[in-house]
């Protein structure tokens, strides 16, 4: 059983892993650190579910709306701690006020990035700000489906390929209370490059990373430099963001992106 013909045809959304009825698929990093599905042939029953669900290869439900809005949150501090105008905060507040759940990308203790679930503003605030590294989806799609089946309002934020993967995974599930939000994505860099960059910073400044910000606004709203805190001492750098904007560290499928157009899969 082969899920994808080449690495340029797999975005790493993990829908195939989460749909497998036998749990035969695991997401494993390759030599560049990107996660790809690997099949345990001793468990696989060759049902083909993993191939059928792939939105990257089989197409996705497009949102043909061409209406555009400019949004600016009323609260300055909320805007300042967000990537831009803090539209995400306002939208997710609506869901949280309805006792719903919000899903997004958050730093973990080791500064890797994973999608997690939030039902309060404290956890939701971990989703604020840019994350220039691909997030590990884990079992997020399963959790979203469970929330919807429990009649909860749900907001999912992520890259366009992650949104498309989620919608394919949900299939005929009632999505009337699902709100999806994708970002204007520049591509997803390798988690291992980010990990090695942090090691480089720790060696250079002789300490441990305690905080990271990919778009530090204290030196200007339009800045494209990262801020790394070593033992709580702040350093303004541009090595990692330079590689990112030069398109040197993105996932192979990002150079073959099916969603880089105005017909986005999200709401």
Residue ranges and their predicted role:
Residues 1-25, 205-228:
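A broadly conserved sequence feature marking short terminus-proximal activation segments
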Residues 1-7, 38-42, 237-245:
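Short, intrinsically disordered, charge-biased short linear motifs at domain edges
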Residues 2-3, 9, 15-32, 36-38, ...:
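Iron-sulfur cluster-binding cysteine motifs and their immediate structural context
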Residues 6-10, 40, 77-81:
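Short, N-terminal intrinsically disordered low-complexity segments that are rich in Pro/Gly
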Residues 30, 42, 105-107:
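Acidic/polar N-terminal loop/beta-strand segments that form early-domain functional surfaces
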Residues 45:
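Glycine-rich NAD(P)-binding loop of the Rossmann-fold in SDR/ketoreductase-type enzymes
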Residues 61-267:
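Iron-sulfur-associated redox domains of electron-transfer enzymes in respiratory
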């Amino acid at each position: 059983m082969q899920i994808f013909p080449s690495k340029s045809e797999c975005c790493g959304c993990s829908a195939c892993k989460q749909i497998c009825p036998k749990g035969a698929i695991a997401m494993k990093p390759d030599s560049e650190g990107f996660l790809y599905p690997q099949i345990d042939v001793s468990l696989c029953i060759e049902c083909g579910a993993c191939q059928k669900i792939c939105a990257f290869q089989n197409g996705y439900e497009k949102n043909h709306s061409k209406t555009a809005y400019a949004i600016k949150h009323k609260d300055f501090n909320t805007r300042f701690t967000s990537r831009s105008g803090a539209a995400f905060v306002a939208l997710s507040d609506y869901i949280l006020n309805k006792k719903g759940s919000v899903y997004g990308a958050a730093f973990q203790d080791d500064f890797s990035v994973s999608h997690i679930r939030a039902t309060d503003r404290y956890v939701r605030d971990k989703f604020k700000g840019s994350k220039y590294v691909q997030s590990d989806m884990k079992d997020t799609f399963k959790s979203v489906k469970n929330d919807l089946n429990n009649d909860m309002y749900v907001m999912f934020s992520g890259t366009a390929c992650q949104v498309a993967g989620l919608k394919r995974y949900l299939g005929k599930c009632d999505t009337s209370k699902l709100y999806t939000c994708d970002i204007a994505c520049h591509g997803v860099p390798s988690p291992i490059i980010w990990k090695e960059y942090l090691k480089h910073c720790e060696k250079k400044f002789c300490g441990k990373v305690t905080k990271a910000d990919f778009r530090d606004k204290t030196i200007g709203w339009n800045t494209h430099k990262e801020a790394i805190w070593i033992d709580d001492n702040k350093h303004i750098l541009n090595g990692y963001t330079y590689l990112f904007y030069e398109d040197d560290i993105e996932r192979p499928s990002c150079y073959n992106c099916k969603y880089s157009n105005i017909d986005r899969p999200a709401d």
